[in-house]
Amino acid sequence: VFEESYKHNYDSLYEATNTQPGQYNYYDSQWHPYFNKTGLHTMQSISKSFTAAAIGIAIKNGHIESVDVPIKSYLKEYEPSFSDKKKEAITIKDALTMRAGIKWDELSMLYTDTTSSCVQMEASEDWIQYVLDQPMENEPGKKWEYSSGVTMLLSKIIFEATGDNVSDYLEKELFEKIGINNYYWKQTPKGLTDAEGGLYLEPRDLAKFGYLYLNNGLWNGNSILPKDWVKNNSAELIDTIWPAFKYGQQWWFIPYDKDNIAWLASGLGGQRLLIVPEFDIVAVFTGWNVYEITALNSYLALQKVLGSILK
């Protein structure tokens, strides 16, 4: 599939651009693409798919009743932020499917643009408050709008429902059970797990997560994720701003013929987890294509993989 491979000295690549301090500087080689130059690679928004898994496990364990529960039920300390009746009606499912209706602008600009809703959230002291301070733009459940902010609401919901941060909850309920031992999660200034983009994993362990979904939540015959939870992810394919890509519950989907779809968890810079159930395939790509270098574009690699499979 691949005719060429690329190796780069990330320190030299970042030398000209690494001018902003802090863990959310996307051009800081201490954080990106490897955590402190270890084998742990940034997952970026693939973290969102892990957060969705945490919600599914919390429902399985009885910590959360269902995805139809309003998010307000778990965000009591932010009750004054729910004066808008539309905001009060947002459910966990609305957040999972990126249809919360909260005004958010993230995909129309680079993540180094200070006007980005995501960048402004990450620069704030209280990420949850920042998200809830944004006005409602649409009725909940009606329109898709990609938002790292609503994933952070899910992070807070996990904490309130289980008493554990997403990082701690997944460690005992998922990672230990499928053999993920080395990882790192960033935290917000308030100590909440950065569930929208803060996970670092080794690529092999990301493949384990994909294999879990390929097998409908089973690992060595043991149910880690409810089978219905996995299947419900693709039960409703939501239109996005890209016609070829649909959305489920913190997962992307690529329909490639009348009856089949590929699953895709995707993150900034070239992080991709591709699952093709029809052919029992799990493929992992990592990179750091924040410089828009075409040769490093993992979507091109993904197209080659799908193309070779579907010939």
Segment roles from a protein language model:
Residues V150-I157, G197-L218, Q271-G287:
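Active-site-proximal alpha-helical segments within enzyme catalytic domains
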Residues A265-K311:
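Structured C-terminal helix/loop/strand segments within mature extracytoplasmic catalytic/sensor domains
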Residues I180-N182, Q187, V230-V284:
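Active-site Gly/Thr loop motif
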Residues W31-H32, K37, N61-I102, D133-P135, ...:
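Active-site helix/loop module of the DD-peptidase/beta-lactamase fold
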